[in-house]
Amino acid sequence: MTPPTASFINPATAGPQPGSFKLSKGSLHACSTTAAPKYEQYVPIKTGEEPIEDFNGHYRFAEIKESHTSRAMTARYMADMMDAAVSDVVIIGAGSAGLTCAYTLAKQRPDLRITMLEASVAPGGGAWLGGQLMSGMVIRKPAHNLLVEIGVPFDDEGSYVVVKHAALFTSTLMSKLLAMDNVKLFNATCCEDLIIKKDQTGAQRVNGVVTNWTLVTMAHGLQSCMDPQTITAPVVIGACGHDGPFGAFSVKRLSSAGLIKLGDMRPMDMNKSEGLIVNNTREVFPGLIVSGMELSEHDGHPRMGASFGGMIGSGQKAAYEAIKLYDSLEIDDGEVVGLKH
């Protein structure tokens, strides 16, 4: 039996969507507070004003108004926010571990709705460069199998491979991930808190995240009363990297709430670290799976430096752990109401 999924709108079956109809005069005041006004988003190309791709001084764009741009962006972003308000899995952090996790999870389970949060404008975390701002990306085997799968070329150096530029891996992975229908990415959006509730046994459980735009979060010391939003999800995955401005967020928040004790990341030992990170990727607190370097802050594993195999393997392991966890839960509209027997 297919497990229940979050109540996302299916554009193919939900009937007329925002943007299907022309906004009539006065309808902003007359419309319900629960429904967005409708508007005409399709702009027909007028005869005699057809776009021309001529680079000899006659290049001409199709006509558009500024309001078309604003409405096109706003309608889609707000529709995404409405859909993601109840998700099946939320991944905090879109670095190498988070992106790999989302790709693996979305591919394995297209029935699950996956929401990613990334505090930076540019997803990818530290995976745009190798070590010390150099371009090459080192990946130890067998994690290179993901490169083969997504079509990223590399130099085979025996026990490891080298991608000529880390950005090639990250951009390729993102292009495949974001093309998937069951994945939504909110970048420039950070996690400010976790939703923690008691489950049916009375135990504390992570059941979603509290979000805000990163620039708002950074301005909390300058302004007051800038409240966040929430995303409800039965499974949350922390992939925020090691300690930093937004790093290791999930485990640091649990620690500050007195719910766990951090192990703190140990000094570098590349050979030891990567295997420990992958093999120990798990649910560290009910409802929260932790992967990548965030796990090193929780468990006290050594740092691994500029070798990315551990991040890839940990992201994949987190995806498989998320599937097992999700399939073990009884879920009602994103909230855990029991365990399957």
From Swiss-Prot:
Subcellular location: Cytoplasm; Nucleus
Cofactor: Fe cation
Record's catalysed reaction(s): [ADP-thiazole synthase]-L-cysteine + glycine + NAD(+) = [ADP-thiazole synthase]-dehydroalanine + ADP-5-ethyl-4-methylthiazole-2-carboxylate + nicotinamide + 3 H2O + 2 H(+)
Cofactor binding, per record: Binds 1 Fe cation per subunit.
Swiss-Prot/TrEMBL GO biological process terms: thiamine biosynthetic process; thiazole biosynthetic process
Residues holding substrate: A97, E118, A119, G126, C191, D227, H242, M293, R303, M304, G305
Enzyme Commission number: 2.4.2.60
Record flagged with keyword Metal-binding: yes
Post-translation changes: During the catalytic reaction, a sulfide is transferred from Cys-225 to a reaction intermediate, generating a dehydroalanine residue.
The protein's name: Thiamine thiazole synthase
